[in-house]
Amino acid sequence: MIEPFKVKDVEIGGPKLFLIAGPCVIESEAHAMKMAEAISGVCKAMKIPYIFKASYDKANRTSLSSFRGPGLHEGLRILAKVADEVNVPVLTDVHDTEQATAAGDIVDVLQIPAFLCRQTDLLVAAAKTGKVVNVKKGQFVAPNDMQYAVTKVRESGNQRVCLTERGASFGYNNLVVDMRALPIMRQFAPVIFDATHSVQLPSAGKDGHAVSGGQPEFIPVLSRAAVAAGVDGVFMEVHDDPPHAKSDGANALDLKLLRGVLTSLLRIREAVTPPAAS
């Protein structure tokens, strides 16, 4: 039985479905603020607990020439402003122990990227900040093996850890979601479904360019399946203009579609939630 915990006013692992959403990368201060305010507005109207996400550095872009973000210090300044002015918890990913320490002073949730989910020093450093640690399951990792990442965080003195499913490698340049992973991982910690990276086509390329592709048309159906399977929260990269996003636009959800997707998710959540004991 998992124990719920809180990120400010957002309960993780409780009865309410929550949303983690924002642009893939911080494109500018103005854009980060715009997206946080827009998504927060939708979530407030729908009474959905919300955590803003954005990266200050996309360290594993396919091409050296791809936009990576504003960097650690400027990115953390912008995330702090989002948290303060929009009044929402914020999440960002960290790639080494020094970043974990610095980001832990600012953000509410430290995310361990899927490619780094087995890096013990990074897990321990993130745990020791005392902030919530969200570990993404590697595309190459069995769901049951994620219990070891959870144990590393907890044995470092931090009980606030959750896991995120983002698809498994399926041949070359493709991912598939095995919904069995969700209840398996939920034996160990609260589970989040990454609805947008799960439809990514890694390094698939487009018109000869070294970029990842995506199939965003499958975001709604996979999200619905994950909520039906009992996830605690949903993670989405949301953008107001996906074709011109500076990172991962090919698999982002268009902001104008967000409310409709969330409406269906809430209906499913209500349908699969057992009635409260009288």
From Swiss-Prot:
Specify where it is mainly localized: cytoplasm
What Gene3D superfamilies does UniProt report for this protein, alphabetically? Aldolase class I
GO biological process annotations for this chain's record? Answer: keto-3-deoxy-D-manno-octulosonic acid biosynthetic process
The reaction(s) catalysed by this protein are: D-arabinose 5-phosphate + phosphoenolpyruvate + H2O = 3-deoxy-alpha-D-manno-2-octulosonate-8-phosphate + phosphate
Pathway assignment reads: Carbohydrate biosynthesis; 3-deoxy-D-manno-octulosonate biosynthesis; 3-deoxy-D-manno-octulosonate from D-ribulose 5-phosphate: step 2/3; Bacterial outer membrane biogenesis; lipopolysaccharide biosynthesis
Check the record and name the Pfam families matching this protein: DAHP_synth_1
For this protein, the record's InterPro entries field holds:
Aldolase_TIM (IPR013785), DAHP1/KDSA (IPR006218), KDO8P_synthase (IPR006269)
Q: Which GO terms describe its cellular component?
A: cytoplasm
Q: Name one GO molecular function term.
A: 3-deoxy-8-phosphooctulonate synthase activity
Q: For this UniProt record, give its keywords in alphabetical order, as a comma-separated list.
A: Cytoplasm, Lipopolysaccharide biosynthesis, Transferase
Q: List the EC numbers from the record.
A: 2.5.1.55
Can you say where in the cell this protein is located? Cytoplasm
NCBIfam families given for it?
KDO8P_synth, PRK05198.1
Q: Which family does it belong to?
A: Belongs to the KdsA family.
Q: Which HAMAP family match?
A: KDO8P_synth
Q: What is this protein called?
A: 2-dehydro-3-deoxyphosphooctonate aldolase
**Annotated organism of origin:** Koribacter versatilis (strain Ellin345)
Provide the organism lineage as a comma list.
Bacteria, Pseudomonadati, Acidobacteriota, Terriglobia, Terriglobales
